[in-house]
């Protein structure tokens, strides 16, 4: 499939809709994000782009981390560590202003899927 056909297939859709359509036709997570970046000419926030810092709740010497940011004026927060809805290594908890509550114990890929809904 050439890029013009892909643009026609995905044209006028939100980033999340594009992602879901690409997954539905068999693209991998990373390939879907790369295609969306090419079509929209936007650099999407990937998990590796998150800047984790010590979480303010580090009162008991157990490592807790958090990252936060904004996309198009919409905020997101990702946390991990003891008692924070993820181990901070493989699983994390994410909250965005579009969600009604935090989503705990999700993978790095799932964090990216939630964050792209802010575009």
Where are these regions (language model features)?
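Intrinsically disordered, low-complexity regulatory segments enriched in Ser/Thr/Pro
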Residues: 77-106
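Hydrophobic beta-strand residues in large extracellular and virion-surface proteins
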Residues: 32, 69, 76-78, 92-94, ...
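Short Gly/charged-rich anion-binding patches and loops
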Residues: 17
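Basic helix-extension-helix modules of the SAP/HeH family
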Residues: 12-14
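Mixed-charge, Lys/Arg-enriched low-complexity segments
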Residues: 41, 95-119
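Negatively charged, low-complexity tracts enriched in Asp/Glu with abundant Ser/Thr
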Residues: 5-10, 23-72
């Amino acid at each position: 499939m050439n890029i013009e056909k892909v643009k026609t297939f995905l044209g006028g859709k939100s980033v999340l809709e594009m992602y879901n359509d690409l997954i539905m036709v068999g693209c991998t997570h990373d390939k879907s994000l790369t295609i969306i970046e090419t079509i929209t000419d936007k650099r999407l926030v990937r998990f590796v782009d998150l800047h984790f810092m010590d979480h303010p709740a580090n009162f008991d010497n157990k490592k807790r981390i958090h990252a936060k940011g904004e996309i198009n004026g919409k905020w997101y927060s990702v946390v991990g560590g003891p008692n924070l809805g993820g181990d901070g290594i493989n699983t994390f908890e994410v909250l965005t202003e579009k969600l009604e509550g935090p989503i705990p114990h999700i993978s790095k890929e799932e964090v990216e899927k939630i964050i792209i809904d802010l575009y």
